[in-house]
Regions:
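Ligand-binding loop in jelly-roll beta-barrel domains
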Residues: 100-129
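Short, conserved beta-strand element in jelly-roll/cupin
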Residues: 50-54, 65-82, 122-126
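Short acidic-glycine-tyrosine-enriched beta hairpin
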Residues: 85-101
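Conserved short histidine dyad/triad with adjacent acidic residue
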Residues: 31-36, 49-65, 100
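A short, N-terminal "cap"/entry segment at the start of jelly-roll beta-barrel domains
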Residues: 1-45, 132-177
Length: 177
C-alpha cells in the first residue's frame, strides 16, 4: 500500500517540463515550480500540488473549470488572486475557494510580493474537463486515458477557440459503415 503521508517540507519542487514551459512573451509573466502529490499519496478523487511562484509571476493564465473545483491554501508569501471581475490581496494563511463555472469563477494567483509565494492546491479530479481562458478567448479539453504499455495513464489534450469548430459531419462523406 502507498504510504498515505507526505511532508511538504521534504518535497522537491521542479519547474514545468520544457514541453509545457511558457515561451515568448508568456515567459515574462508565468513561472511555476511544483510537486504533484496526489499519486504519491495514493489519492484517487482529489489532486494535491505544492506550488511556488517567484515574485512578479503567475503560475497559470486566468482560467475557469467547468467540472473541477479548486482550493488554495497560501503557505508563505503574498500576492493577489483574481476571481471573475474582482482581485483580492492574499497572504500566508489565506484559504481560497474556486468552484466550477464559467468566466465568473475564472481565477489566477499572482505573486505581487518580493519573496517566493508558496501554496497548496487541492482539486477534484473529474474528467473530462473543459477549461476556459477568458483573457485569450481559448478553451481546453483535457481527459485522462487508459494506461499505455508503460503503465502510465494516457492523456488527451486539445486547446482551441470557438471559431475553429468543425461541423459535426465534416469529413464524413466516405464509407458509411
Amino acid at each position: 500500500m502507498t504510504r498515505p503521508i507526505v511532508n511538504i517540507h521534504e518535497v522537491s519542487l521542479v519547474p514545468r517540463p520544457a514541453e509545457f514551459a511558457p515561451e515568448g512573451p508568456a515567459a515574462e509573466h508565468f513561472a511555476l515550480s511544483s510537486a504533484q502529490l496526489a499519486r504519491p499519496l495514493g489519492a484517487k478523487k482529489l489532486g494535491y500540488g505544492l506550488c511556488a511562484l517567484p515574485p512578479g509571476k503567475a503560475g497559470y493564465p486566468f482560467h475557469s473549470h467547468r467540472e473541477n473545483e479548486e482550493m488554495f491554501l497560501v503557505l508563505q508569501g503574498s500576492g493577489e488572486v483574481r476571481i471573475g471581475a474582482e482581485t483580492y490581496p492574499i497572504r500566508e494563511g489565506d484559504l481560497i475557494a474556486c468552484p466550477p463555472g464559467g468566466p465568473e469563477t475564472a481565477h489566477q494567483i499572482r505573486n505581487t510580493g518580493t519573496a517566493e509565494l508558496r501554496y497548496l492546491a487541492v482539486s477534484t479530479r473529474l474528467g473530462p474537463e473543459i477549461c476556459e481562458y477568458p483573457d485569450s478567448g481559448k478553451f481546453g479539453v483535457y481527459a485522462e486515458l487508459a494506461p499505455g504499455k508503460d503503465g502510465k495513464p494516457g492523456y488527451f489534450y486539445f486547446m482551441g477557440r470557438p471559431e475553429q469548430q468543425l461541423d459535426y459531419w465534416a469529413g464524413e462523406g466516405g464509407n458509411p459503415g
